[in-house]
Amino acid sequence: MKTLISLVLLSLLTLGAVVAIGFPSQPSVAAYNPEAQTSADETLKAFAAIQPIDVHVHMFETDAAFQAMLERLHLKLLNILVMDDTLPYRKELAPQISDTLALVRSSHGHVAWCTTFDPYKFGDASFTADAIKQIDQNFAQGAVAVKIWKNIGMEIKNGEGKFIMADDPKFKPIYKDIAKHGKTLMSHQAEPDVAWGPPDPSDPSWSYYQENPQWFLYNKPGFPSKQEILQARDHVLAENPDLRMVGVHLGSMEKSLDNIASHLDRYPNFAVDMAARMEYLLITPPEKVRAFLIKYQDRVLYGTDLDFLPDADVKDVLNDWQSTYARDWKYLATDETVQFAGKQIHGLKLPAPALQKIFRGNALHWIPGL
């Protein structure tokens, strides 16, 4: 009897030691039972167990509490630079590069970075050569990818007053250089359908255009159609079969999984991330989303588009990031319900191999160097 009691006590002590250690050091979807999750903390433990990679964030600051969150969640981020002349902290590229290099150094391996080039210098005679020189320098500094943004196609015009598109001949040598270095192009071309109108307050992206009306093109003549912009993007894919491209924001095909699927079938060098478009998946029939993610589990990368802006309140940032990660994991990994837009959305409970790829493996495959 004493022997039995001793064994029980030893087992309990061993269990306590394991619990005290914290999250596992190796990625494992099975390390936690999703069905047993009853709190956001438990959900985040399950999220952390897979050692997730968020391939789409925008960081301008960091903080000891934020770094602690990254370490606790075993989370790696891809910090993406963007040139945007409407925002003071995105108007100049050099300060962004300097700041992100400092963030990378202070992150202890939790932050990687994606550079960009200045499309507002498109009219310069040396534009292409200068862009290649700059991104090559950034590759030497550790950049793992290059971003092109929606201002190509929706804002910047050439000397003839026409909107420049992603397949403009000036960009071709840049794409060739990215492919030559084995890097990845992160492509944000076009916007959700609602940007072309008519107004739809029920659309998940509607609030963005209330705050950023310059990108709402309804009843604004002279702008390219969404189809024109995406056709130019597709032309880049076809012309550059050796170039890995991640179409961010579900490749701006957020309302049609069938359209995304046809693109993934047509272009083997193309993948998509989920950044800022999870809400569109949430309002799509769960069985359709689940079937799509299982079939194309090698071609979808997890991303959020979360940001840490200058002078942001750290507590608000931590709450926003952690609640987003908890919601997304709960939706994709469990069969519990997620609340969105006043509705109860049934979780997808994706198979473990699919979760491993979407939250980690695909990022490592499609963006080498992470």
Can you name each region flagged by the protein language model?
Residues 31-34, 221, 226-235, 242-370:
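H/E-rich (His + Asp/Glu) clusters that bind or coordinate divalent metals
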Residues 45, 94-217, 268, 278, ...:
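Active-site gating/metal-coordination segments in enzymes
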Residues 7-17:
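Bacterial N-terminal signal peptides
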Residues 1-4:
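Positively charged n-region of N-terminal signal peptides that target proteins for export
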Residues 56-64, 84-96, 120-129, 156, ...:
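Acidic-and-aromatic substrate-binding clefts and catalytic sites of carbohydrate-active enzymes
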